[in-house]
């Protein structure tokens, strides 16, 4: 029996979903004011490359296999401020009803108004994610959340990467891969080229 099976059921897998530039930047792909940390001035850089036919289909396919979402605090707050106002759109309705987790030491339960959301404290991150990973289920999907993703990669708690590699170099910004002199091998499982030049790639942890 595969190590990814749990009493005959596939265990939950941790997948990272990112819009990413050629130089590895994931900061603020969706909006001008999404994240200006570090003086970042290219907010919304990914929007002109979005191909609904290819990229939209890939997002829909991944969401169908996703049982829960995990966010860092900043990304969760951006999402919580946007998606509830888009009720009626099928993807927005899915975002609003799916189970969500947010990693934060500052949010209180009263702040978690984008239901259903459960708060995970930073000190409990590895333990909580490992526990979720050991449950039967589909994907635990992490969108954006660069600092959180780096932490999970460094702890070897990532099973798959879903990357939309966009034909642009941004010259600076937040990245997701740890700078820790550790090699981590991934196997390419699928690749599709969008009409806008975006490479839609899926990788799974190798070895």
Question: Where are the predicted features?
Answer:
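Periplasmic plug
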Residues: 160
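Portal/gating segments that form or line small-molecule/metal binding sites
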Residues: 6-157, 167-207
């Amino acid at each position: 029996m595969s190590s990814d099976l749990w009493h005959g059921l596939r265990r939950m897998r941790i997948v990272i979903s990112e819009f990413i530039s050629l130089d590895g930047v994931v900061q603020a792909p969706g909006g001008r004011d999404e994240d200006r940390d570090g003086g970042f001035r290219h907010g919304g850089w990914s929007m002109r490359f979005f191909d609904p036919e290819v990229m939209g289909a890939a997002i829909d396919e991944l969401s169908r296999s996703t049982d829960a979402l995990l966010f860092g605090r900043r990304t969760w707050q951006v999402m919580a401020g946007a998606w509830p106002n888009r009720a009626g759109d099928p993807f927005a309705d899915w975002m609003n009803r799916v189970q969500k987790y947010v990693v934060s030491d500052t949010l209180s339960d009263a702040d978690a108004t984008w239901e259903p959301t459960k708060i995970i404290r930073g000190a409990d991150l590895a333990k909580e994610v490992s526990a979720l990973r050991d449950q039967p289920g589909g994907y635990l999907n992490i969108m954006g959340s660069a600092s959180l993703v780096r932490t999970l990669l460094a702890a070897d708690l990532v099973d798959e990467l879903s990357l939309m590699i966009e034909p642009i170099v941004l010259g600076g910004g937040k990245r997701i891969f740890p700078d820790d002199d550790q090699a981590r091998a991934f196997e390419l499982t699928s690749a599709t080229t969008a009409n806008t030049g975006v490479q839609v790639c899926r990788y799974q942890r190798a070895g």
